[in-house]
């Protein structure tokens, strides 16, 4: 597995401070969970015959699963990896109903730390089933470039702060900004 420092930072935040993901989930999926909602961290390691796949995050809020991947650059194969990850998550949490199974994919998104004009708002793939039915697998993307430091604070997307400097060419935080973050974290 090729981890980047960004993967490590993202996974550590999810593991140690999962409540930071709630505003991001609300932003992306148009939900309105309170910041103190109960969050269950699901396994992010999934065994497959050809090896283990590791996702960045898999969270359960209420009865909904959420899967967020952090990507440092726009990778055109990401949609295929997301289908693989989501299928592994769905299989692991499949519900047996008599002789039939219900496999539900999590609500997923990709956080692109760097993106270009070609980075889509949704990653999509056509999935053709044996009966000929085609379903569009579509997941939203979150692009750091779309957020200013002010919008990060206004929307309480503090999870994005460690990644903000990498998508800016000029210094982006003042001493006052750092004190503001310290006050927010100290109050939690």
Region annotations inferred by a language model:
Residues 1-188:
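Elongated, amphipathic alpha-helical interaction scaffolds
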């Amino acid at each position: 597995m090729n981890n980047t420092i960004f993967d490590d930072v993202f996974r550590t935040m999810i593991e140690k401070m999962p409540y930071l993901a709630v505003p991001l989930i609300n932003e992306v999926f148009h939900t309105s969970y309170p910041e103190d909602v109960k969050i269950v961290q699901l396994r992010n390691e999934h065994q497959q015959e050809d090896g283990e796949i590791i996702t960045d995050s898999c969270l359960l809020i209420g009865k909904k699963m959420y899967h967020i991947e952090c990507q440092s650059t726009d990778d055109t194969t990401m949609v295929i990896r997301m289908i693989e990850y989501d299928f592994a998550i769905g299989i692991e949490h499949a519900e047996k109903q008599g002789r039939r199974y219900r496999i539900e994919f999590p609500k997923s998104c990709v956080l692109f730390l760097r993106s270009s004009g070609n980075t889509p708002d949704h990653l999509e793939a056509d999935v053709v089933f044996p009966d000929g039915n085609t379903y569009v697998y579509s997941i939203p993307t979150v692009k750091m470039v779309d957020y200013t430091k002010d919008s990060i604070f206004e929307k309480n997307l503090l999870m994005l702060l460690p990644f903000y400097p990498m998508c800016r060419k000029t210094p982006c935080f003042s001493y006052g900004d750092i004190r503001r973050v310290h006050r927010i974290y100290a109050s939690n």
